[in-house]
Amino acid sequence: MTDSSNAHEAENPTVPTPDNEIQDLQQEIATLKAELKEKNDKYLMVLAESENARKRMQKERQEMMQYAVENALIDFLVPIESMEKALGFASQMSDEVKNWALGFNMILQQFKQVFEEKGIVEYSSVGQKFNPFLHEAVETEETTKVPEGTIVEEFSKGYKIGDRPIRVAKVKVSKAPAPQGTEAEIENNNE
């Protein structure tokens, strides 16, 4: 029987030995560790993507709220400017009108305070170099008193939040005077 069992073992070499079992188990452990690492990496990637999406959505929501507030406040700019102009004339009126103007001026200051709290500030343009990002030129004026492209008059104020204008200022811009000479000389030069 020993001869036959030896012959049987020789025919069937897949009988596990303790060393083979250990090797197989170590291989299986290594494979499982690699799979676990891969799944953990995928989990961390999905978690990071989810966190980024959450932050992006939160930022978009905040921007939408900010734009909604801006748009609502922008609608008040024209009436506020009208009130400022009217209050400018109050100093020429009777004492009773001046007293009323003081009250309206307080209300105007409250509006301006709300604007500042929301980050909306007006900017002055007179004396500044024309910037198409901040200004809309509605008129030009020939002059040698200031360099060409300088704003000489402001028709309506500009407003911005941070560096972003929400309403550009409407201005008059200086330009260099036309060359001196008679019309006939200018026409002859053009021909």
Curated annotation (Swiss-Prot):
Compositionally biased region (Basic and acidic residues): 1-11
Name by which UniProt lists this protein: Protein GrpE
Primary gene name: grpE
InterPro entries per the UniProt record, alphabetical: GrpE (IPR000740), GrpE_coiled_coil (IPR013805), GrpE_head (IPR009012)
GO BP term (any one): protein folding
GO cellular component: cytoplasm
Subcellular location: Cytoplasm
Known role: Participates actively in the response to hyperosmotic and heat shock by preventing the aggregation of stress-denatured proteins, in association with DnaK and GrpE. It is the nucleotide exchange factor for DnaK and may function as a thermosensor. Unfolded proteins bind initially to DnaJ; upon interaction with the DnaJ-bound protein, DnaK hydrolyzes its bound ATP, resulting in the formation of a stable complex. GrpE releases ADP from DnaK; ATP binding to DnaK triggers the release of the substrate protein, thus completing the reaction cycle.
